[in-house]
From Swiss-Prot:
Pathway: Pyrimidine metabolism; CTP biosynthesis via de novo pathway; UDP from UMP (UMPK route): step 1/1. It catalyses: UMP + ATP = UDP + ADP. Belongs to the UMP kinase family. Disulfide bonds: none annotated. Keywords: ATP-binding, Cytoplasm, Kinase, Nucleotide-binding, Pyrimidine biosynthesis, Transferase. It is found in: Cytoplasm. This is Uridylate kinase. It comes from Syntrophomonas wolfei subsp. wolfei (strain DSM 2245B / Goettingen). Catalyzes the reversible phosphorylation of UMP to UDP. It is an enzyme of class 2 (transferase). GO terms for biological process: 'de novo' CTP biosynthetic process; UDP biosynthetic process. ATP binds at residues 12-15, 55, 59, 168, 171.
Length: 238
């Protein structure tokens, strides 16, 4: 097998991706598929960090839109990401993989607090390190958390797991004629509002030169393909 193109990655998993075909909760088949794929990547001596969202359980923006205090709604969303992180940790450990969950909000009974140097040490020891609770601050998305953690741990790429095989100029589910992009630069993403990630996250990636690969999570084996440098999905960079 060819050598991996990237040696340290951040995999961004949305809560919706963990829900699979459901609208709420966690799909065990999806969870186990992700775990198998991550183990496959780690066996190639790639260091894997994962940032999880919480939209399958609670979305802070949705709560705010219904009149809830935005900060409170966002903190609830951060707690939802911890639930997802623990579920993913369990799935990975059932595959025999060493893991650590690190939360931006301290809850020492269930996971470690996020400490940058400790996170890097876990990665160097071959442990899959799962970052939960976003940035720990309201008003920031888990996409921004993925960009921030990538910069902090000096990850070489962010793999954005989606339910579609890349970035399109329109929703491919609603518009079969939507055009798929194989490659974009950060300015395209920011100026055209293509939905890769929010503008704060995209700007952070641009400022720190962190490339993004948007790919289809539903096809098993795609995480490894992206790590090996195969042309899948959409590449966003300079």
């Amino acid at each position: 097998m060819q050598k991996p193109k990237y040696k340290r990655i951040v995999l961004k998993l949305s809560g919706e991706a963990l829900a699979g075909h459901n609208t709420y909760g966690i799909d065990n088949e999806v969870l186990n598929s992700i775990a198998r794929q991550v183990v496959e990547v780690v066996r190639q001596e790639v260091q894997v960090a994962i940032v999880v969202g919480g939209g399958n359980i609670w979305r802070g923006v949705a709560g705010s839109a219904k009149g809830m205090d935005r900060a409170t709604a966002d903190y609830m969303g951060m707690l939802a990401t911890v639930i997802n992180a623990l579920a993913l940790q369990d799935a990975l450990e059932q595959e025999g993989m060493g893991t650590r969950v690190m939360s931006a909000i301290e809850m020492k009974e269930v996971c470690e607090p996020y400490i940058r140097r400790r996170a890097i040490r876990h990665l160097e020891k071959g442990r899959v390190t799962i970052f939960a609770a976003g940035t720990g601050n309201p008003y920031f998305s888990t996409d921004t958390a993925a960009a921030l953690r990538s910069a902090e741990i000096e990850a070489e790429v962010i793999l954005m797991a989606k339910k579609v095989d890349g970035v399109y100029d329109a929703d491919p589910v609603k518009n079969p004629a939507a055009l798929k992009f194989d490659r974009l630069n950060y300015i395209d993403v920011l100026s055209r509002g293509l939905g890769v990630m929010d503008s704060t996250a995209a700007s952070l990636c641009m400022d720190n030169g962190i490339p993004i690969i948007v790919f289809d999570l539903t096809r098993e084996g795609n995480i490894l393909k992206a790590v090996l440098g195969e042309e899948i999905g959409t590449y966003v960079g300079r």
